[in-house]
From Swiss-Prot:
Name of the gene this protein is made from: Mxd3
GO biological process: negative regulation of DNA-templated transcription; negative regulation of transcription by RNA polymerase II; regulation of transcription by RNA polymerase II
Organism: Rattus norvegicus (Rat)
PROSITE patterns from the UniProt entry: BHLH
Name of the protein in its database record: Max dimerization protein 3
Recorded superkingdom: Eukaryota
UniProt-annotated stretches for the region Interaction with SIN3A and SIN3B: 8-25
UniProt-listed InterPro entries: bHLH_dom (IPR011598), HLH_DNA-bd_sf (IPR036638)
SUPFAM superfamilies recorded: HLH, helix-loop-helix DNA-binding domain
Length: 206
C-alpha cells in the first residue's frame, strides 16, 4: 500500500501544479518561481530563432504529445474513479478532488488492513490455546480409558477365579458323595454276603 500512497501523493502534486497553471492561463499572469525568493519573478529564456517550417513541425509534435498525455491521464483518472467506493459521488469531479478522495480511501484501506492483521493474530493465539486444551483433554481421556480397561480386566479375572473356586467345591462334593456311596454299597454287599454264608452254613449243619 505504501508505493500506491506515494504515487497518489505525486499525482496530487502534479494535479495541483496543473490546476495552478490553468488558473494562471485564465487570469493572464505568470506564477512565481518555486525555487527563488518571493520577490523575484521568473524570467523565461528566449527561445533561439528557428525557421518557420521547423517551428511549426515542432509545435505540431508537441501538441500531439500533449494530446496523448492528456488522453492517457483521462483514462487513468477514469479507472481510478471506478475503483472508488460506490457511495462517493464523483460524477462531477476535478482531478485534485478525485486524487484527494483516492488518498483518503487508501488510508482507510490501510487502517482496515491493520485491524484485520491484529484480529488475525488474536485468532491465531486463540487457536493455539484451544489446541493445547484439546491435547490436554485427549490425554486425560486416554488415562481414564486405560484405567477403565484395567478395572474391567481385574473384574473379569476376579469372576474367573470365583467360578474356578465354585467348580472346585462342586467337584469335591461330587467326589465325596461318590466315595461315601461306594463305601455304603460295599458295606451293604458285605453284609448281604455274610448273611448268605451264615444261612448256607446253617443248612449244612442241619
Amino acid at each position: 500500500m505504501e508505493p500506491v500512497a506515494s504515487n497518489i501523493q505525486v499525482l496530487l502534486q502534479a494535479a495541483e501544479f496543473l490546476e495552478r497553471r490553468e488558473r494562471e492561463a485564465e487570469h493572464g499572469y505568470a506564477s512565481l518561481c518555486p525555487h527563488h525568493s518571493p520577490g523575484t519573478v521568473c524570467r523565461r529564456r528566449k527561445a533561439p530563432l528557428q525557421a518557420p517550417g521547423a517551428l511549426n513541425s515542432g509545435r505540431h509534435v508537441h501538441n500531439e504529445l500533449e494530446k496523448r498525455r492528456r488522453a492517457q491521464l483521462k483514462r487513468c483518472l477514469e479507472q481510478l474513479r471506478q475503483q472508488m467506493p460506490l457511495g462517493v459521488d464523483h460524477t462531477r469531479y476535478t482531478t485534485l478532488s478525485l486524487l484527494r478522495g483516492a488518498r483518503m480511501h487508501i488510508q482507510k484501506l490501510e487502517e482496515q488492513e491493520q485491524q484485520a492483521q491484529r484480529l488475525k493474530e488474536k485468532l491465531r493465539s486463540r487457536q493455539q490455546s484451544l489446541q493445547q486444551q484439546l491435547e490436554q483433554l485427549q490425554g486425560l481421556l486416554g488415562v481414564r480409558e486405560r484405567d477403565r480397561l484395567r478395572a474391567d480386566s481385574l473384574d473379569s479375572s476376579g469372576l474367573s477365579s470365583e467360578r474356578f473356586d465354585s467348580d472346585q467345591e462342586d467337584l469335591e462334593v461330587d467326589v465325596e458323595s461318590l466315595v461315601f456311596g461306594t463305601e455304603t454299597e460295599l458295606l451293604q454287599s458285605f453284609s448281604a454276603g455274610q448273611e448268605h454264608s451264615y444261612s448256607h452254613s446253617t443248612g449244612t449243619w442241619l
